[in-house]
């Protein structure tokens, strides 16, 4: 049945709806240190940025899972030793029997081997890895090039921490000087009386605190 005339309409709630912000998706903006802010990558998480800069996100032991690396460094390090199986193929190809052109002297002894691969450069598939002569030339896909950046940032942070800082002495404000002078004009050097004066000491400052402020006023 439909709504009748006597049915009461539901009153709208006057309380606004609470909107939950998605904090993990909020971009981090480090403002504490200029050096870290300069080397910060907004496309990476906090853990990834700190790991790249050589810093720790927490001083305690990890309690949960470990965040994956930037580009799968664990798998790439294993591939760095045998990338795409090139080392196995290269060793197999080097051990295979093949024909070469040699240069002999008048007595028939081999003087030198004519290298035709350098001139021919057989690369029918245009493989960019064909130019790598040895396995030592391969640097892998890992993030080893990021280590110098982290070391450089850590060294600069350590140098900044070793710079001696001048200790700034807190001064007294004009209103604070007027308040202390009014206490001294009424009670002299009696700090206990200043502490019990509810009219001039409405914030109930202790005797030790008033004495410390008076020494700062006198430059002691």
UniProtKB/Swiss-Prot annotation:
InterPro entries (UniProt xref): Ribosome_biogenesis_Nop16 (IPR019002)
- Primary localisation category: nucleus
Q: Biased-composition ranges for Basic residues?
A: 1-26
Listed GO biological process terms: ribosomal large subunit biogenesis; rRNA processing
The record's annotation in Pfam families points to: Nop16
**Which protein family is it in?**
Belongs to the NOP16 family.
Protein's name in the database: Nucleolar protein 16
- What species is this protein from? Pyricularia oryzae (strain 70-15 / ATCC MYA-4617 / FGSC 8958)
């Amino acid at each position: 049945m439909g709504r009748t005339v006597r049915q009461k309409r539901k009153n709208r709630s006057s309380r606004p709806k609470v909107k939950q912000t998605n904090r993990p998706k909020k971009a981090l903006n480090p403002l504490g240190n200029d050096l870290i802010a300069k080397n910060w990558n907004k496309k990476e998480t906090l853990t990834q940025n700190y790991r790249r800069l050589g810093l720790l996100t927490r001083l305690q032991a990890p309690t949960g899972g470990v965040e994956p690396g930037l580009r799968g460094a664990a798998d790439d390090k294993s591939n760095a030793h045998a990338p795409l199986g090139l080392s196995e193929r290269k060793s197999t190809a080097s051990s295979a029997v093949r024909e070469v052109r040699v240069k002999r002297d008048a007595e028939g002894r081999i003087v030198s081997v004519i290298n035709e691969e350098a001139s021919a450069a057989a690369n029918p598939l245009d493989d960019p890895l064909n130019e790598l002569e040895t396995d030592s030339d391969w640097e892998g896909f890992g993030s080893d090039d990021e280590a110098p950046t982290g070391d450089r940032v850590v060294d600069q942070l350590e140098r900044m921490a070793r710079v001696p800082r001048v200790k700034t002495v807190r001064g007294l404000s004009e209103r604070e000087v007027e308040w202390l002078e009014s206490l001294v004009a009424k009670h002299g050097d009696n700090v206990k009386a200043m502490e019990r004066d509810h009219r001039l000491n409405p914030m109930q400052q202790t005797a030790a605190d008033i004495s410390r402020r008076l020494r700062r006023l006198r430059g002691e």
